[in-house]
Amino acid sequence: MDWQFIGYIAFTYLFASIPFGYVIGKLFGKDITKEGSGNIGATNVTRTIGKKAGILVLILDLLKGFIPVYYAKYLFFDTKHIAIVALAAVIGHCFSIFMKFKGGKGVATGFGVLIAISGKVALITFLIWLGTFLVSGYVSLASIISASLSWVMIFYLEIGRAHV
């Protein structure tokens, strides 16, 4: 590994560690870690502050996965390096240095990674999430099922490409 790549991994981890749910909660005068489920993610922000704040957190958390992986595809090219960047983004979100190594569940950030890797698989994953949510009414169940199936789809729909 070269120093440029190591620096990019450190940048990705720190960028993904920004606790947008916590920051937005504070802007609304709330400590999101002490409200609702205590999670800093979009679902808890939506429940405790409102839809607009929740959507903002969702988009910002999604970008924490999308931006580093999208640019990694052009900086490093090979699947191994891109996968390490993706992992650094999700780890940064879930174990934020700014939150004493606590964080969100990684669903939105992981979905941002997925969009950067394969828009086709991301769209199918979103449709699975939406269908599961509409049938069950549970964000958590929809997230678990769609996230589990997304990596199966990556394997079967994207395997054999020169790079992700």
Region locations from a protein language model:
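Interfacial segments of multi-pass membrane proteins
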Residues: 46-49, 72-75, 107-136, 148-158
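Membrane-helix interface "capping/anchor" motifs
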Residues: 99-102, 131-145
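Alpha-helical transmembrane segments in multi-pass membrane proteins
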Residues: 8, 12-13, 17, 21, ...
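Helix-boundary and loop/linker segments of multi-pass membrane transporters
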Residues: 1, 43-47, 75, 102
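Membrane-helix interface segments
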Residues: 2-5, 51-53, 77-82, 105-107, ...
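Conserved small/polar residues in nucleotide/adenosyl-binding loops
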Residues: 162-164
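Cytosolic, membrane-interface loops and tails of multi-pass inner-membrane proteins
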Residues: 22-54
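Mid-bilayer segments of alpha-helical transmembrane spans in multi-pass integral membrane proteins
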Residues: 94-98, 118
